[in-house]
Amino acid sequence: MEDKYILLSAVETFKSRLEELLMQSAKVQKQTMLRKELASSMNDMASTVQEALNKKKSS
């Protein structure tokens, strides 16, 4: 009976840790997505500024 309790406790601990890791993974994926969106926005802004500078030079 005691072995069964020890095994159940180990399974619960494993389950809890796995849930924590899944949550951390989701946070990392979200941060990665946000970084990509930020980089894309910065590239768009840089392109817009470059176009404006080119137009100003040609005027």
UniProtKB/Swiss-Prot annotation:
Keywords: Cell cycle, Cell division, Centromere, Chromosome, Chromosome partition, Cytoplasm, Cytoskeleton, Kinetochore, Microtubule, Mitosis, Nucleus. GO terms for cellular component: cytosol; kinetochore; microtubule; Mis6-Sim4 complex; nucleus; spindle pole body. One of its GO terms (biological process) is cell division. It is found in: Nucleus; Chromosome, Centromere, Kinetochore; Cytoplasm, Cytoskeleton, Microtubule organizing center, Spindle pole body. The keyword Protein transport does not apply. Its main location: nucleus. Component of the kinetochore, a multiprotein complex that assembles on centromeric DNA and attaches chromosomes to spindle microtubules, mediating chromosome segregation and sister chromatid segregation during meiosis and mitosis. Component of the inner kinetochore constitutive centromere-associated network (CCAN), which serves as a structural platform for outer kinetochore assembly. Component of the inner kinetochore constitutive centromere-associated network (CCAN) (also known as central kinetochore Sim4 complex in fission yeast), which is composed of at least cnl2, cnp3, cnp20, fta1, fta2, fta3, fta4, fta6, fta7, mal2, mhf1, mhf2, mis6, mis15, mis17, sim4 and wip1. This is Inner kinetochore subunit fta6. The gene is fta6.
